[in-house]
Amino acid sequence: MLQNYAIVLGMAVAVAIWYFFKIEEEAPPGPNPPKPDPPKPDPPKMHMPKKKPHWMDPHLTGSQTVQYSRNRSMGDPIRGDLPIIPRDDGWFSTAANPAHTLHAGALSMIAPASTGGGLTVNKLISAYADKGNAMSGRHNSPSYYGSS
């Protein structure tokens, strides 16, 4: 029987504690309500100097100053380049100079008589060799630029 009184007394204490906390939560604030914490100041900003962009350049840029119209990797090192004669007049004139851009292939260097294309490439290169002072290979006359 004593156990029953202890259970009832424990329940009454639990209800009283619950009621006490419930009343405290619903109570209106007093004359000096608590103020919220002030915001924390921002940390000091460090002004870092801007980094210069890093540009990736090919390693052989300095050694290929003559090669303006194409890369060496685009040619055929075994058979050589095709001997196409550039046009120096009209709309379709090219900036290519065969003396600077064409390369004879390895086969034409080994046996130039057996490969007709190698002889033609060598003739074309030698024909344009005198235009080496003008990098484009064009005749840079005043009429070319539209003035007389």
UniProtKB/Swiss-Prot annotation:
Keyword ATP-binding: no
This protein's record includes keyword Transmembrane helix: yes
Region feature Disordered, mapped onto this chain: 27-61
GO CC aspect terms: host cell membrane; membrane
Regions that span the bilayer: 1-21
Pfam families in the cross-refs: DUF5850
Subcellular location: Host membrane
S-S bridge residues: none
Principal place of residence: host cell
Alphabetical keyword list: Host membrane, Membrane, Transmembrane, Transmembrane helix
Membrane topology (UniProt): Single-pass membrane protein
Name assigned to this protein: Uncharacterized protein 020R
Organism, scientific name: Frog virus 3 (isolate Goorha)
